[in-house]
């Protein structure tokens, strides 16, 4: 039986927004059964709540952003990814600004925060979105696809003409579980190229970016003194992003995801296409002890 999960305790963190450069205070609070993931802009009067739902995505340029009642929540994908990785269904995320803190550019610090707060099971079965038929979206040569699958599997291929991103390190696939996520995916950082810096600055993007929270490349090499955490950290981060983007479906997907040069825009388009076709998916729960669990979540960590 897989039950819903929330936090045991409230926990707080401070950081800077990757794109805004603004300092932000974040508070993660427990939430009741079937509450879902809800962001709360506590700097606004009155306070505005923004549910983590794919249909509220309005920003897909270099991040995933939500808008509800004119209130924006930017760069949600890394926290959403960590919540998916640890199986957290219900949580309140309070923010003092419009953008989540970027932390170190990965989901690792969010995983640490969630584990430090403690994760508890709730008295209700976890609800999954089971893919019943293949759904695919494209944009030029970019592809994102869901296919039926017993568990949750993600594959991703990137293509960059750069000596640090050779073809042999441009493809990765994982069978999703908490262990695989925390060890193989969660610490992969976001990345950017020096050549794109001017473009980003003109659009007020990346204002909080630095080598402390991103991998930075020039035309030939990685500029960060500490180098890479994984040889294929770039494609692993794309999987990290996809896990977060797909969790905006409103539940954990059961199926196989395949991305080819996909990004936030195409991932959101895929989720919307899936949810728009009532014959392509169904809600399922696993509340019988005799039923094998389709996804392996770690035993809750009680803080």
From Swiss-Prot:
Keyword Cytoplasm belongs to the record: no
Any GO molecular function: UDP-3-O-acyl-N-acetylglucosamine deacetylase activity
Catalytic activity: a UDP-3-O-[(3R)-3-hydroxyacyl]-N-acetyl-alpha-D-glucosamine + H2O = a UDP-3-O-[(3R)-3-hydroxyacyl]-alpha-D-glucosamine + acetate
Record's keyword terms, sorted: Hydrolase, Lipid A biosynthesis, Lipid biosynthesis, Lipid metabolism, Metal-binding, Zinc
InterPro entries per the UniProt record, alphabetical: Ribosomal_Su5_D2-typ_SF (IPR020568), UDP-acyl_GlcNac_deAcase (IPR004463), UDP-acyl_GlcNac_deAcase_C (IPR011334), UDP-acyl_N-AcGlcN_deAcase_N (IPR015870)
Pathway field: Glycolipid biosynthesis; lipid IV(A) biosynthesis; lipid IV(A) from (3R)-3-hydroxytetradecanoyl-[acyl-carrier-protein] and UDP-N-acetyl-alpha-D-glucosamine: step 2/6
Signal peptide: none
Cofactor(s) the protein needs: Zn(2+)
One BP term from GO: lipid A biosynthetic process
Transmembrane segments: none
Keyword Lipid metabolism: yes
Active site annotation, chain numbering: 264
E.C. number: 3.5.1.108
Residues that coordinate or bind Zn(2+): 78, 237, 241
A cellular component annotation (GO) from this entry: membrane
Enzyme's top EC category: hydrolase
Matches recorded under Pfam families: LpxC
UniProt xrefs under HAMAP family: LpxC
Biological function: Catalyzes the hydrolysis of UDP-3-O-myristoyl-N-acetylglucosamine to form UDP-3-O-myristoylglucosamine and acetate, the committed step in lipid A biosynthesis.
Family as reported in the entry's similarity comment: Belongs to the LpxC family.
Name the record gives this protein: UDP-3-O-acyl-N-acetylglucosamine deacetylase
Originating organism: Stenotrophomonas maltophilia (strain K279a)
């Amino acid at each position: 039986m897989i039950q819903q999960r929330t936090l045991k305790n409230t926990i707080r963190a401070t950081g800077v927004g990757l794109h805004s450069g603004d300092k932000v205070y974040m508070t993660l609070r427990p939430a009741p059964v079937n509450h879902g993931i809800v962001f709360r802009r506590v700097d606004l009067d009155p306070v505005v709540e923004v549910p983590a739902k794919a249909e509220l995505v309005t920003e897909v340029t270099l991040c995933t952003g939500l808008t509800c009642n004119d209130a924006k929540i930017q760069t949600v994908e890394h926290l959403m990814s960590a919540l998916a990785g640890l199986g957290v269904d219900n949580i309140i995320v309070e923010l003092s600004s419009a953008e989540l803190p970027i932390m170190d550019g990965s989901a690792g610090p969010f995983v640490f925060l969630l584990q430090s707060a403690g994760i508890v099971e709730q008295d209700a079965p976890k609800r999954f979105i089971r893919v019943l038929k293949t759904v695919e979206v494209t944009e030029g040569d970019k592809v994102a696809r869901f296919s039926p699958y017993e568990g949750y599997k993600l594959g991703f291929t990137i293509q960059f003409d750069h000596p640090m991103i050779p073809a042999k390190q441009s493809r990765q696939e994982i069978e999703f579980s908490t262990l695989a996520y925390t060890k193989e995916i969660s610490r992969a950082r976001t990345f950017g190229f020096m050549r794109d810096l001017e473009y980003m600055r003109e659009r007020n993007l990346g204002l909080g970016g630095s080598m402390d929270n991103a991998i930075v490349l020039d035309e030939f090499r990685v500029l960060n003194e500490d180098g890479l955490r994984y040889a294929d950290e770039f494609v692993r981060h794309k999987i990290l992003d996809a896990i977060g983007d797909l969790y905006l479906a409103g539940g954990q997907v059961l199926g196989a995801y395949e991305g080819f040069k996909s990004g936030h825009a195409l991932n959101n388009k895929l989720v919307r296409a899936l949810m728009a076709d009532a014959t392509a998916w169904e809600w399922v729960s696993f509340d019988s002890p005799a039923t094998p669990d389709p996804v392996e979540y770690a035993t809750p960590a009680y803080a």
